[in-house]
Amino acid sequence: MSEPYIIYNDDGWSSYMRYPAPMSPEEVVAVTVAPVAGTGVKVYQFCALGGHAVNYNSAFLPRVGEMLPAVDTLHVWRMRETLRHLESLGTNPLQIVSQTCHDNGLACQFSLRMNDRHHTYRHGDGSWYFPELLSPWLDANPHLLLEDRALDYTKDEVADYRLRQIQEVLDRYDVDGIDLDFTRFKPWFRPGEEAVGRPKMTALLRELRLLTRRHGKTLSARFEYNPQVCISSGLDVEAWLAEGLLDQVTLGGTGDHTPDAPSDWWVRRAHAADCKVFPGIEGQLHWCPGSGGGGGGLHPGDGIADGFGPPSLEYLRAVAANHYRSGADGVSLFNFTCADGPFARAAFDELAQPETLEGKDKQYVAALWPWDAQIFYEPWSSARFLEPDQFEAGWELQLADDFELQRCLRHDFSAVLTLEWKGLNRISDFEISLNGVALAWNGYEYNHYDHGCWNDIVQYSVPSFALRQGANRLALHRTAIYPGFAGRTEVRKCVLDLRFNQTITPGALN
């Protein structure tokens, strides 16, 4: 296995929309490649969103915002002005980013969202949410679109459209590879046409493989963590890997974050075909149901502790460490350029050094929501619950740390388990255990309103001897019934904060 590294995906417009316009080439460098140059990031992915209205210069695709008769949203105006200014200087973001990557020893991949739907979203009054992403090609080809105006990949003309886009990028720009983002968004075909569309999508992948090889470039793709979801949507991913169509796979979700999604299935099949795997971590975490368009407070938040914002360094370490135990070649960072708040730059080095993650503080989170839930937009039912007459429930937490090693080294560590309860009358109504060891309430409780009811955040002390590397069984035992209550008792958040004592105390009695 080669040295691990990080893939950094720039979401395509936040790097220009969030800064005063017009931006100079030097200013573009300062907010894109410069922050990650010289770190564990070795691949920079330049995202072109859905590829209908683009953020680079194209001979046949409009630039973002150029189709609007007037612009009344500042961030769209900023991007349009910056793109116009750069064009007047004879350059554009893709040219700037790719050149800067090469100047700093990074590979630059052009990443295309295969069915991005931002251009399909509407307000309640029917007006477009992102009119800056509309394109004449979409208006001229309604017969090639699904009902929501996304692409229908059963149509041969859609494959031709994508091939033309990628051919142009390979001809005009000095990129090192093409990346196909299949997490944005299924469906690819009309309902019931997956069997018809599957071979057509495979044919497109084969053509793109030949095209990139002729140019001496790599071909990679981003998929949802759950392979069965990909396969059922009409993506023959297992065959693609076996056929050697891809050099690199990154993983992610269509929802907000996937802190404990396994990557084993992908690692086994990809490595057999000499393809590398980089599980993904989202740069923006959401748990607040009412803050759909952004943070609701007056200061940046921590994605887990505050319900909205970027992940903590401890969260990043935990996710990465578990994937390295599964044999991942590194990690990928997605949408960090649009994070609502700061995140630790140290992550760009630490996450590329799996051996240094051992013995460092971590925040392990269990995903209790559906795979594709937009947590902050919609109510959702937890996957972990007890019916009114149910007395036992449980699930596993995957912990990457070698606790036996830490004990042998006489390193002190401690852990706190935080659960959010919905439908809990008293804390004593449930006994909690980890690997058969009873956990005691540590005195912390926070009652708050969420998803239509009052929920309770409760913390439990976890004895260090209860922790194991790998699977840890968390069990719930009901000790009280609620006569006349017909609702479920749900666990809606499950977070284990692991802390290592970094001090040295000379002298001991044992």
Language-model regions: role of each:
Residues 43-51, 248-259, 304-372:
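Substrate-binding cleft of secreted/luminal carbohydrate-active enzymes
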Residues 421-506:
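Beta-strand-rich ligand-recognition modules
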Residues 407-417:
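Extended extracellular/luminal ectodomain segments enriched in beta-structured repeat modules
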Residues 16-17, 22-26, 49-54, 87, ...:
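Acidic-and-aromatic substrate-binding clefts and catalytic sites of carbohydrate-active enzymes
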Residues 27-54, 171-177, 245-249, 323-330:
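Catalytic domains of carbohydrate-active enzymes, especially glycoside hydrolases
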